[in-house]
Amino acid sequence: TATAEYRVQGRGGKGLKGMETRDAQGEDEASDFVEHLFSAHLHDFLLFFTNTGRMYVERVYQIPEASRTGKGRSIKNMLNLRAEEKIASVLILKAQGAEDEAMWAADKYVLFATKDGTVKKTALEEFKNYRKDGIIAIKLDEGNDLVDVVLTDGNKEVCLVTHEGMCARFHETGDDPTSPNLRPIGRATAGVRGITLDDGDFIVSCITNEPDTMVLVVSENGLGKRTAFDEYRLLANRGGKGVTTMNVTDKTG
């Protein structure tokens, strides 16, 4: 949908309809809802990562355009998803014209975060030989799901945020460059412990920092707060419990 169909509004408003969603077709089926929102140019590449750890690639112009209130098309009509797969995260690679090969830069990395607190870093160039039927992006244990994927230059600070409002912040390299927190490893491999979770807790998001970054945390019931990235304690090593980023209550959801 063209961005011109949307307008800037103040916080606290009702907003306007961004998409018509599909209602449940029976008692055993849930109604559809929006999970991902991003902007991209027509010739950019979209990297779709699924909950089972596979990756699919499409160009933006290959996705049919629809009005702001249109229902759109099922992603399964565009990607050869397997029966159990759903989209967990999307990365955008900016088109480089005749030099599209340059998008798969050797100094860029894909950082994965899974439901059980595992993280993995893999060189972006390992994904350039993609196939229509998808490729393995990360190996997952049974019962674990891929939750979020971000792009990094290998020298970022990472924040892992959990369902119960915890946040673990650590640097990719750590204090000792000879023994980094996150080493680049192969595509079809599992990862390492990123955060220690309490019983019943799980990862909901992963972000990396930029200069003067602010962290926006939004709860299920629409409460949000903005905090400077530096207010989160930097852990010397990955795998810690982190600190509270939001007190989760009945009010927040």
What positions do the PLM features span?
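Short, structured "edge-of-domain" segments at secondary-structure transitions
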Residues: T1-G253
